[in-house]
Curated annotation (Swiss-Prot):
The modification Phosphoserine is found at S12, S14, S43, S62, S66, S135, S159, S334, S341, S353, S362, S974. Residues 35-48, 390-405 have a biased composition (Polar residues). Highly expressed in testis. Detected at low levels in placenta, liver, pancreas, thymus and colon. The modification Phosphothreonine is found at T111, T336, T937, T978. Essential component of the mitotic spindle required for normal chromosome segregation and progression into anaphase. Required for chromosome alignment, normal timing of sister chromatid segregation, and maintenance of spindle pole architecture. In complex with SKAP, promotes stable microtubule-kinetochore attachments. May contribute to the regulation of separase activity. May regulate AURKA localization to mitotic spindle, but not to centrosomes and CCNB1 localization to both mitotic spindle and centrosomes. Involved in centriole duplication. This is Sperm-associated antigen 5. Disulfide bonds: none annotated. Residues 545-608, 759-868, 979-1174 form a coiled coil. Induction: Expression is cell cycle-regulated, with an increase from prophase to cytokinesis and return to basal levels at the next G1 phase. The lineage of its organism: Eukaryota, Metazoa, Chordata, Craniata, Vertebrata. The keyword Cell cycle applies. InterPro entries: Astrin (IPR028728). Residues 482-850 are annotated as: Interaction with KNSTRN. Homodimer, with a globular head domain and a long stalk. Homooligomer; the globular head domains associate, resulting in aster-like structures. Binds to microtubules in the mitotic spindle. Interacts with DCLRE1B/Apollo. Part of an astrin (SPAG5)-kinastrin (SKAP) complex containing KNSTRN, SPAG5, PLK1, DYNLL1 and SGO2. Interacts with KNSTRN. Interacts with RPTOR; this interaction competes with RPTOR binding to MTOR, resulting in decreased mTORC1 formation. Interacts with G3BP1. The complex formed with G3BP1 AND RPTOR is increased by oxidative stress. Interacts with OSBPL8, PCM1 and CDK5RAP2.
């Protein structure tokens, strides 16, 4: 009994367990052979069905088959299994990406149902061969042929990795069967075939019944060998892909690796029970194929000539052939109806289809295939059994060799028409074109499968002519008739095989090209899947990172909002402190203005003092005249006057020394006061600069919050500054008018001199206290400035972080730019008006400066003139005093004798000179200089007891009057002395009172003069400070105007950027519409693909093959979205980094400037504090200075 050894196949990955294997429409074409029966039934001598019809699942009357059919069935089963392996491999690739082995084992049944195939466990696609092992001797003929179709279920595996070869084929050996009616069974090695597509099921020519199959002619063999040369079109055999897609143009590049070989029949070896495994190889040269075919035919003829068929009628009597044989004979062997190829048959059935017309233009063979339209396919030689009893020749036998050739020519001509116009290289086609070709081939195959089903149903009906033609009578003939019968049958079999080979060659070439192409497309699809999975993983990681970053940014934004609120609170506190400092400065300015008014009043009183001095000089002239008259009467008093004059010189020297010291002290005080005032002005200016710096910092913060508020605040500040300056100017005008009125009424204020002096002392004390307060205030301001510096440093740090998010707020602010533009226009108009006002103020300031210069020059000239007059008057006085002293000295020389008497008699009680009053100006000077010099001893002045005037009065009374008569002279002298004593006492008293009043007036006038000079200097400094303030205000306005212009430019640039962004948005919208259209197109294409794939599926199977397309489309969409998101996030991050860097640089520059300004302010405040500490005690009594010291401390 024959056995078939199955070696392991390995194909594409198997589907997962639990999932039904998907079945393509062409899977239904691989139907079961009809020669399957139980072991008890006998097989016929030869079958009336061809291997192609057996492959379609057609049955004869009995379930037996001939040896020829057995061998043909073995060959077709091998090719169909190759095809089914590749189809199952694609189907399983659609379900999972991991490769799992398949084990295709077709189950052969006697009914025309579809074959169920299992899964092959391996995956290496190596080609193994079938080895037929002879059964033990004595078995019956039906056991030989009946199975050994069951064992044909175990199939050969096909190598996809290398070309097939036939040099290393395993030779199948057939042992002769021991029996009465069989001579031997010759087994010829089966030649390899290509992986045949289902087209060979349709185009293989069926042989005639056994009586006609034994006739063979040399012409058919020669035609067969000639067709081999034309059929050697190369094709690639290393890639097998699904059978559901068959029609694509073959590639010339892929066709270069295909070779065809035949086995040399001389290498056949007959053995019993042997089993060998070899690899398969195709022939490479057409000459070898011709010689091999001729050798094959000769070997068959030699074997058949030695064999006999004794009992063919008996076997035919057991056979019940069906009507399918006659139908096949009609289709393939009749003269009226020629054999057609499957595409021609499809064209005949679907002649009105538009799709077929498109396929005619698109699906056609290249020029190489058109030239090689008729080719030979290597086929397996049949194991022929011979009988001792030859069968009788049939009357109704028909020779199908000619009709078979005609059908082949017809089919090749039709395939040439259908396969013309294709490009030679499939790799040049796009993916869309390949998909369209696949869809069209699927439609063709679907229609083909349906028509094949119809054909099978038609062939299932028995026909009496085929039944009559296939019957044989058990009659014995001579050896010559048997040999002729065998030759006829072999000739007819050769013709049928030649026709099938020609048709199959064309189908194999196309299927091989298609399989290789589909394998490449699957490789690309796998690569796309891997890339998509990698991109999806990357996108998932990127999305996770983005979400983490967003969470961190939200937390940081909340913290920054809290810090921003704290910064706002601190800013409010700083503004409050600034307002308090401005209030203190306003109070200080008011006090300074009061002090200036008081000094101006003192100037008026000084002028009055000058008039009084002139009156005093006139009175002194009158007194000198009276003294000359009295000198004649007071000759006796010259000696006393001389002594008094010496004492008076001593007093004069002391007085001049005191005056010089007082002048030096006053000059030092004036210098110190000037320095203090200058330092105060510098401190005020620096304080203003600090306030300006703070205003700038606050302005920058407000610019981040909103530029509109900053402009309004700056406008309000400028308005308040202008109003304050205008008020100051009005006050100055009013003060000037008041000074003029006070100058007119200065005569009325002479009576209030003492009270004014008291008020001056009190005001000095108040000023000292105020200076101390101001020092304290400056200290407090310094501490607050340090605190504000720390706060500003923190705020700057906070601003560095808040400015990152200020950009996001700026995006919202872009919407408000329209309103801001209107406001900016209005502010520009207001600023232009204010610039005009500032220009007018510049003119007024220049006029005021000119007036100040003129007044200062006038005052200096007046002061110089006054000093010259005073010096001249003092010179005259000194000359008069010197003349008086000389006159008295001459008189004293003449009367030296009377000096002793004057010294003895003039001894009245002396009085101590009173200490200088603290309320006088001299007392204040002495108390101020007490720390530097020791207290000087009191010196007798003009009105004291030690002065010369008192002694003169006493001496005059004792002066005797010399007369010729002693008694008369003594009486007259006594009378004269009494009169002189009374007169001298009166004169002395009047002189002392006048001198005292004059001394007081001189001291008061000197104090007033000094005070007025100080006032003038203070007024001049105040005016200079005001001028500087105005200049600074103008500079600030110019700076503000420049800053506003820069802000306007920036806003214009932002507006232009917005316009550009709007254009970009329009372009983006257009791109979005284009993308939506392309997306709709892609959706329609995916729907069509899904429907096409769903159409491929069997109605009994679940639609699982379209899931991978949906997954791929979804993955590609997700990858595109994530890629766009990643690019957007990257661009936004770069923009934020650039903005952050620019803001950071600006803030660092501002911080550096603010640090410098704060250092300057600290130095200024420290310098002010030191200078205020070095102020003399006279000025320390001012309350404002004391308050300032307290503030600074």
């Amino acid at each position: 009994m024959w056995r078939v050894k199955k070696l392991s196949l390995s194909l594409s990955p198997s589907p997962q367990t639990g999932k039904p294997s998907m079945r393509t429409p062409l899977r239904e074409l691989t139907l079961q052979p009809g020669a399957l029966t139980n072991s008890g039934k006998r097989s016929p001598a030869c079958s009336s069905l061809t291997p192609s019809l057996c492959k379609l699942g057609l049955q004869e009357g009995s379930n037996n088959s001939s040896p020829v059919d057995f061998v043909n069935n073995k060959r077709t089963d091998l090719s169909s299994e190759h095809f089914s392996h590749s189809s199952k491999w694609l189907e399983t690739c659609q379900h999972e990406s991991d490769e799992q082995p398949l084990d295709p084992i077709p189950q052969i049944s006697s009914t025309p149902k579809t074959s169920e195939e299992a899964v092959d466990p391996l995956g290496n696609y190596m080609v193994k061969t079938i080895v037929l092992v002879p059964s033990p001797l004595g078995q019956q003929q039906d056991m030989i042929f009946e199975a050994r179709l069951d064992t044909m279920a175990e199939t050969n595996s096909i190598s996809l990795n290398g070309p097939l070869r036939t040099d290393d084929l395993v030779r199948e050996e057939v042992a002769p069967c021991m029996g009465d009616r069989f001579s031997e069974v010759a087994a010829v090695s089966e030649k390899p075939i290509f992986q045949e597509s289902p087209s060979h099921l349709l185009e293989e020519s069926p042989p005639n019944p056994c009586s006609e199959q034994l006739h063979c002619s040399k012409e058919s063999l020669s035609s067969r060998t000639e067709a081999v040369r034309e059929d050697l079109v190369p094709s690639e055999s290393n890639a097998f892909l699904p059978s559901s897609v068959l029609w694509l143009s073959p590639s010339t590049a892929l066709a270069a690796d295909f070779r065809v070989n035949h086995v040399d029949p001389e290498e056949e070896i007959v053995e019993h029970g042997a089993m060998e495994e070899r690899e398969m190889r195709f022939p490479t040269h057409p000459k070898e194929s011709e010689t091999e075919d001729q050798a094959l035919v000769s070997s068959v003829e030699d074997i058949l000539s030695t064999c006999l068929t004794p009992n063919l009628v008996e076997m035919e009597s057991q056979e019940a052939p069906g009507p399918a044989v006659e139908d096949v004979g009609r289709i393939l062997g009749s003269d009226t109806e020629s054999w057609m190829s499957p595409l021609a048959w499809l064209e005949k059935g679907v002649n009105t289809s538009v799709m077929l017309e498109n396929l005619r233009q698109s699906l056609s063979l290249p020029s190489m295939l058109r030239d090689a339209a008729i080719g030979t396919t290597p086929f397996s030689t049949c194991s022929v059994g011979t009988w001792f009893t030859p069968s009788a020749p049939q009357e109704k036998s028909t020779n199908t060799s000619q009709t078979g050739l005609v059908g082949t020519k017809h089919s090749t001509s039709e395939t040439e028409q259908l396969l013309c116009g294709r490009p030679p290289d499939l790799t040049a086609l796009s993916r869309h074109d390949l998909e369209d070709n696949l869809l069209s081939s699927l439609v063709i195959l679907e229609v083909l499968s349906r028509q094949l089903r119809d054909w099978k149903s038609q062939l299932a009906v028995p026909h009496p002519e085929t039944q009559d033609s296939s019957t044989q009578t058990d009659t014995s003939h001579s050896g010559i008739t048997n040999k002729l019968q065998h030759l006829k049958e072999s000739h007819e079999m050769g013709q049928a095989l030649q026709q099938a080979r020609n048709v199959m060659q064309s189908w194999v070439l196309i299927s091989k090209e298609l399989i290789s192409l589909l394998h490449l497309s699957l490789l690309h699809l796998e690569e796309d899947k891997t890339t998509v999975s990698q991109e999806s993983r990357r996108a998932e990681t990127l999305v996770c990172c983005c979400f983490d970053l967003l969470k961190k940014l939200r937390a940081k934004l909340q913290s920054l909002k809290a810090e921003r609120e704290e910064a706002r609170h601190r800013e409010e506190m700083a503004l409050r402190g600034k307002d308090a400092a401005e209030i203190v400065l306003e109070a200080f300015c008011a006090h300074a203005s009061q002090r200036i008014s008081q000094l101006e009043q003192d100037l008026a009183s000084m002028r009055e003092f000058r008039g009084l001095l002139k009156d005093a000089q006139t009175q002194l002239v009158g007194l000198h005249a009276k003294q000359e008259e009295l000198v004649q009467q007071t000759v006796s008093l010259t000696s006393t006057l001389q002594q008094d004059w010496r004492s008076m010189q001593l007093d004069y020297t002391t007085w001049t020394a005191l005056l010089s010291r007082s002048r030096q002290l006053t000059e030092k005080l004036t210098v110190k006061s000037q320095q203090a005032l200058q330092e105060r002005d510098v401190a005020i200016e620096e304080k203003q600069e600090v306030s300006r710096v703070l205003e700038q910092v606050s302005a920058q913060l407000e610019e981040c919050k909103g530029q509109t508020e900053q402009l309004e605040l700056e406008n309000s500040r400028l308005a308040t500054d202008l109003r304050a300056q205008l008020q100051i100017l009005a006050n100055m005008d009013s003060q000037l008018k008041e000074l003029q009125s006070q100058h007119t009424h200065c005569a009325q204020d002479l009576a209030m001199k003492d009270e004014l002096l008291c008020q001056l002392t009190q005001s000095n004390e108040e000023q000292a206290a105020q200076w101390q307060k101001e020092e304290m205030a400056l200290k407090h301001m310094q501490a607050e400035l340090q605190q504000q510096q720390a706060v500003l440093a923190k705020e700057v740090r906070d601003l560095k972080e808040t400015l990152e998010f200020a950009d996001q707020e700026n995006q919202v602010a872009h919407l408000e730019l329209g309103q801001v533009e209107c406001q900016l226009k209005t502010t520009l108009e207001v600023l232009r008006e204010r610039s005009l006002q500032c220009e007018n103020l510049k003119d007024t300031v220049e006029n005021l400066t000119a007036k100040l210069a003129s007044t200062i020059a006038d005052n200096q000239e007046q002061d110089l003139e006054k000093t010259r007059q005073y010096s001249q008057k003092l010179g005259l006085l000194t000359e008069q005093l010197q003349s008086l002293t000389l006159f008295l000295q001459t008189k004293l020389k003449e009367k030296t004798e009377q000096e002793t008497l004057l010294l003895s008699t003039a001894c009245p009680p002396t009085q101590e000179h009173p200490l200088p009053n603290d309320r006088t100006f001299l007392g204040s000077i002495l108390t101020a200089v007490a720390d530097e010099e020791p207290e000087s001893t009191p010196v007798p002045l003009l009105g004291s007891d030690k002065s010369a005037f008192t002694r003169v009065a006493s001496m005059v009374s004792l002066q005797p009057a010399e007369t010729p008569g002693m008694e008369e002279s003594l009486a007259e002298m006594s009378i004269m002395t009494t009169e002189l004593q009374s007169l001298c006492s009166l004169l002395q008293e009047s002189k002392e009172e006048a001198i005292r009043t004059l001394q007081r007036k001189i001291c008061e006038l000197q104090a007033r003069l000094q005070a007025q000079e100080e006032q003038h200097q203070e007024v001049q400094k105040a005016k200079e400070a005001d001028i500087e303030k105005l200049n600074q205000a103008l500079c600030l306005r110019y700076k503000n105007e420049k800053e506003l212009q820069e802000v306007i430019q920036q806003q214009n640039e932002k507006i232009l950027e917005q316009i550009d962004k709007s254009g970009e948005l329009i372009s983006l919208r257009e791109e979005v519409t284009h993308l939506t259209r392309s997306l709709r197109r892609a959706e329609t294409e995916t729907k069509v693909l899904q429907e096409a794939l769903a159409g491929q599926l069997d109605s009994n199977c679940q639609p699982m093959a379209t899931n991978w397309i949906q997954e791929k489309v979804w993955l590609s969409q997700e990858v595109d979205k994530l890629r766009v998101m990643f690019l957007e996030m990257k661009n936004e991050k770069e923009k934020l980094m650039i903005k952050f860097q620019s803001h950071r640089n600006i803030l660092e520059e501002n911080l550096r400037r603010s640090d410098k300004e704060l250092e300057k302010l600290d130095d200024i405040v420290q310098h002010i504090y030191k200078t205020l500490l070095s102020i003399p005690e006279v000025v320390r009594g001012c309350k404002e200075l004391q308050g300032l010291l307290e503030f600074l401390s």
